[in-house]
């Protein structure tokens, strides 16, 4: 778990004074999911997996759950996430954490494919996808 916090600190905790000629833009700093619930971490040896995810125009993401936090950073397009009868819309530039253990589904509601960077914050031996 300490490694997870170190990785998250490196990704999100740096400020622009660290880079002499660079620029750092904070994408997300939160203790809650995009649905307003507290973030819950699994116990065990941390294993972070990052990948690019694409949803075609009109395409759904079938109902599913996660047993670990998932950070989603929308790079292109617009997606509607539905969970517990409520809908949340995220567009390019938005970042959010999905709830752990709660069924949700999504749909591309824009006119271009949705491209997102997805960071799964699981543990060793846990199935990610």
Which functions belong to the PLM regions below?
Residues 4-9, 14-47, 96-97:
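A short, N-terminal "cap"/entry segment at the start of jelly-roll beta-barrel domains
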Residues 44-47, 58-71:
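A short beta-loop-beta micro-motif enriched in histidine and acidic residues
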Residues 50-52, 71, 95-97, 118:
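Conserved hydrophobic/aromatic beta-strand scaffold that supports enzyme active sites
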Residues 60-62, 80, 96, 100-107:
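Histidine-centered metal-chelating micro-motifs
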Residues 68-84:
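Glycine- and acidic-residue-biased ligand/ion/polar-headgroup-sensing regions
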Residues 85-101:
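Short acidic-glycine-tyrosine-enriched beta hairpin
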Residues 101-126:
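Ligand-binding loop in jelly-roll beta-barrel domains
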């Amino acid at each position: 778990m300490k490694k997870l916090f170190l990785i998250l600190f490196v990704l999100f905790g740096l400020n622009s004074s660290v880079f002499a000629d660079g620029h750092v833009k904070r994408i997300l700093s939160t203790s809650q999911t995009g649905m307003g619930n507290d973030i819950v971490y699994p116990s065990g040896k941390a294993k972070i997996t990052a990948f690019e995810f694409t949803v075609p125009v009109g395409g759904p993401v079938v109902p599913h759950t996660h047993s670990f936090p998932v950070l989603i950073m929308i790079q292109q397009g617009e997606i509607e996430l539905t969970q517990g009868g409520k809908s949340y819309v995220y567009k390019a530039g938005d970042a959010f954490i999905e709830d752990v253990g709660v069924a949700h589904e999504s749909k591309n509601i824009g006119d271009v494919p949705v491209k997102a960077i997805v960071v799964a914050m699981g543990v060793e031996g846990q199935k990610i996808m």
